[in-house]
Amino acid sequence: MKLKSLIKSTSDWFSSTPERALNRAYKSALKIQEIETKHFRGQKVSRENADYGASVITYFETEVQSYLQKINMELTVFKASRLFLSLSNLQDTENNLGTGKVKSEQETTAIIIFDKLKFIDEVIAKYKSNAIEKNVSNNVAIIAASERNPEVTNSAPSGKKSTKVKDQGVKNKTINFESASQKTGVLPRSFMNTLNKIKQEIDPKSGESEEQVLTKYRKSRYRTALSIKFILLLIIIPLLIHQLTKTFFLIPVVEQYFSRHEQVIFINRDLEDEALEELQHYEETLHFRGLIGLGPELSPEKIEQEVKQKAGEITEEYRRHGIDSIANIFADLFSFIAFVLVLVNSKKEIEVVKSFLDEILYGLSDPAKAFLIILFTDMFVGFHSPHGWEVILEGVAHHFGLPENREFNFLFIATFPVILDTVLKYWIFRYLNRISPSAVATYKNMNE
């Protein structure tokens, strides 16, 4: 009874999601209208429609932008949930078309929704050119373009920097992105950075130098924030897709298949052997506890009854394990597709993140670089790495419900670390040796 009431309350809550989202968006639009009426003579919140100072205008613009973001988010929830409910309740709608009361209620609800959406559109129409989104896209474009052409940002006058960056970016679409790993020369990069820093500090054009420093600081701060945000998205979105698809779609489908095929208990022979071993161990434990007096001495019939009950529990446990394993295969596939889609639709962000990671990696001190290289090599390709790879392969097999294959494990351990070690050595002597030769020398000394 409690389960039915819980399911009903959950269903009612989900059915009212579009209405709640629309009401929240409507209230945010009312807040914006209230600010316009009280402080800007019913016009758009801007400097042209009021006589306030810059601080007051900035405050009201920030408030309006927060309300606009809430409206966009709630409208997205409204559209998605309404679409899902319209698809799931299509049959009920067709069955109730002839009911006059239901039809009247639907018409009334549609009129209310139409009026609220119309009011929201009228309010947000004044702010279609969202300053925040425009600033974000411009900053991404400026960072990506300036990373390709650093001289554009540095040489342009302050009033024409963004224009020159955009023009230069359009003219030089074929220029490849130049990361820190590609800026190599005869002298070490750290030595050249020191010379450039001294040159900048003694530059007689101090005003221009200060402006360049401030521009670099702002660009670095924004690049750091954008990189961290993008990395978090790469982690959170696949995990979220994995959990949602597995919980709400895949597990119910696989459970339905197992319920129709009750004879299917184990998805591979290894799981069956584990279950039989566990059941045998339980039966022997009952005999042992009865013999040494730790428990009541059970008759053969009682032992058989206990073992039968335990067999049912083991069956349910391994059926659940099989369901999870099959669902994991498809959930991981959906997660991988989501990961690839994020990468495909974020080319500018990838360039910024690549530059950010290059600056972190190549900005480390030489001992720190050598320490990280030795830690990585010893962990993944060193003497003790086969044990770690064995644990990883067993975990992957258990995650997907695959039987353990010792021959495949040994073959993988014998080949993959060797390939990884070759790639790492190529990177060290192809790139790191030209960028930071002292780090390579430190690595050799520490490794010896």
Curated annotation (Swiss-Prot):
It is a multi-pass membrane protein. The chain crosses the membrane at residues 231-251, 323-343, 372-392, 408-428. One of its GO terms (molecular function) is proton transmembrane transporter activity. Coiled coil: none annotated. InterPro entries: CemA. It comes from the Bacteria. Required for H(+) efflux immediately after light irradiation to form a rapid H(+) concentration gradient across the thylakoid membranes. Together with PxcL, contributes to transient H(+) uptake following dark to light transition. Belongs to the CemA family. This is Proton extrusion protein PxcA. The lineage of its organism: Bacteria, Bacillati, Cyanobacteriota, Cyanophyceae, Oscillatoriophycideae. The gene is pxcA.
